Amino acid sequence: MPEYRSKTSTHGRNMAGARALWRATGMKDGDFHKPIIAIANSFTQFVPGHVHLKDLGQLVAREIERVGGVAKEFDTIAVDDGIAMGHDGMLYSLPSREIIADSVEYMVNAHCADALVCISNCDKITPGMLMAALRLNIPTVFVSGGPMEAGKTKLADHNLDLIDAMVIAADDSASDEKVAEFERSACPTCGSCSGMFTANSMNCLTEALGLSLPGNGTVVATHADREQLFLRAGRVAVELCHRWYGGEDPTALPRGIATFEAFENAMTLDIAMGGSTNTILHLLAAAQEGEVPFGMRDIDRLSKRVPQLCKVAPNTPKYHIEDVHRAGGIMSILGELARGGLLHTNAATVHTRTLADAIAQWDVTQVDDDKVHTFYKAGPAGIPTQIAFSQATRWDTLDTDRSEGCIRDVAHAFSQEGGLAVLYGNIARDGCVVKTAGVDESIHVFEGNARVYESQDSAVKGILADEVKAGDVVVIRYEGPKGGPGMQEMLYPTSYLKSKGLGKHCALLTDGRFSGGTSGLSIGHASPEAAAGGAIGLVRNGDKILIDIPKRSIDLLVSDEELAARRTEQDAKGWKPVEVRPRKVTTALKAYALLATSADKGAVRDKAMLDG
């Protein structure tokens, strides 16, 4: 049987010094024979999705110790993409994912922890911790801080989220008073932003990967039911320790759970619920860390056969994450996918032997269990707060309408084509991604003239100055992992296109990425990126670009001979932006750029550069 990793520092005469230090943290004689379980928290007062996490690590710690483990908590960093957006702060967002993964690895390996509880929530924190978990491959369970409640105002006929505040602010016809009302109403509570944006998408995907508990992605942060998720996560961490160190059960480890089949399940869910395109980036990165051969071609294959069963903001103003929970949460979406023959239901989870067992226990349309039904009735209270577990409001009824409700069955899907697609062509040889759930069907095939910008800042200025016209394809390049560096999100350009009335009349193509709040014909992750010699760096103003989502293609309508000539010219000039960009690229960012791969590889470090 495997020995506790912690035995390295807790046993033997030569470890007297280490034990003395452990004792100084509060450990007693009897603790040195127990598993030491690390709790990676991510509390910060900078991020609404993390502002309520301060005491939750200790909540988990007490439960771990109650059931026989030793708990030791530490914190990672957390960047708020919304606050960092629109200025040089966004250069740090994606690189922070690697820092988070490294920090978890450093703490866990330096102290020889036996298991891990990841308390995450927002955009780069869940992916960073997921990457670390798959690197470390020790018993791990995820529990998130939960989604924010949707905002409410008398000035709108639908609930609000962050994107509504951004779009109205860019609308010149909106009064200052209306903008202020939206701003004050859009983000009423602690938690990750209330739509199917990156944070919530990733927290939902951990359920499909099998690494978190039912409800992890959908119980609002303010609800008392989420406290039980934290307590149960502590108990599960100890159970996983017993299964691995006491029984050498490989399905107690992340790599035994998050297999190729589990990654296919997670991507299938992502496509079915129209999740953020960033999830593709993060799943690819996590797969690389876990040595799982899951890539863009697999995503492309899945996108052609998985229907869209759930439609949530920003793809529709009608539903937010709180509505997904009322409809049965992720387990109900997985249930519909399973009945459609679209899942590997034999995949393991941290809480059941198989995913099939989990669905059988938690799918509200199949289970006649009052406790399960009551759990999924947990709803918002509509009271602004930054306090976790501060309310116990419940919906009167569940939404189990699978023909016209928030979650549909396969026969009544919102679309038989899923919510995400991978496009290939001469402008993106290694692929690019589009959130089809947010694209109006009238522009699924689009041909337009290129309007080229060498930075997000220039594109924003151009859009606001009315340089972009209906029928244009806005091209924003040198914003990839290397070129940015840091692969900025392009939420401001897409929001401003909407505010100018061009949301259904233009396309946007970039080697950068998009916020989970983006909708419209927004195509990101163009690979290879311009800074790596990608063809997006060869586009010139006025070039015709043809986008065909049904055919999964995107092409620059320029002859091969002309492209070859342009490439020769660009090789001589160097693959860098023509304009001088007023951004400060620090040593830390340069170090990230030096090793970063393009988006089709998850923008992870190029290990060949390190190994070679």
UniProtKB/Swiss-Prot annotation:
Positions of modified residues (N6-carboxylysine): K124
Keyword set includes Cytoplasm: no
GO CC annotations on file: cytosol
Any GO molecular function: magnesium ion binding
Disulfide-linked positions: none
Cofactor(s) named in the record: [2Fe-2S] cluster; Mg(2+)
Entry-linked InterPro entries: Dihydro-acid_dehy_C, DihydroxyA_deHydtase, DiOHA_6PGluconate_deHydtase_CS, ILV_EDD_C, ILV_EDD_N, IlvD/EDD_N
Catalytic activities: (2R)-2,3-dihydroxy-3-methylbutanoate = 3-methyl-2-oxobutanoate + H2O; (2R,3R)-2,3-dihydroxy-3-methylpentanoate = (S)-3-methyl-2-oxopentanoate + H2O
SUPFAM superfamilies: IlvD/EDD N-terminal domain-like (SSF143975), LeuD/IlvD-like (SSF52016)
Top-level EC class as recorded in UniProt: lyase
Protein role: Functions in the biosynthesis of branched-chain amino acids. Catalyzes the dehydration of (2R,3R)-2,3-dihydroxy-3-methylpentanoate (2,3-dihydroxy-3-methylvalerate) into 2-oxo-3-methylpentanoate (2-oxo-3-methylvalerate) and of (2R)-2,3-dihydroxy-3-methylbutanoate (2,3-dihydroxyisovalerate) into 2-oxo-3-methylbutanoate (2-oxoisovalerate), the penultimate precursor to L-isoleucine and L-valine, respectively.
PANTHER family: D-XYLONATE DEHYDRATASE (PTHR43661), D-XYLONATE DEHYDRATASE YAGF-RELATED (PTHR43661:SF3)
Protein name per Swiss-Prot or TrEMBL: Dihydroxy-acid dehydratase
The organism of origin for this protein: Xanthomonas campestris pv. campestris (strain B100)
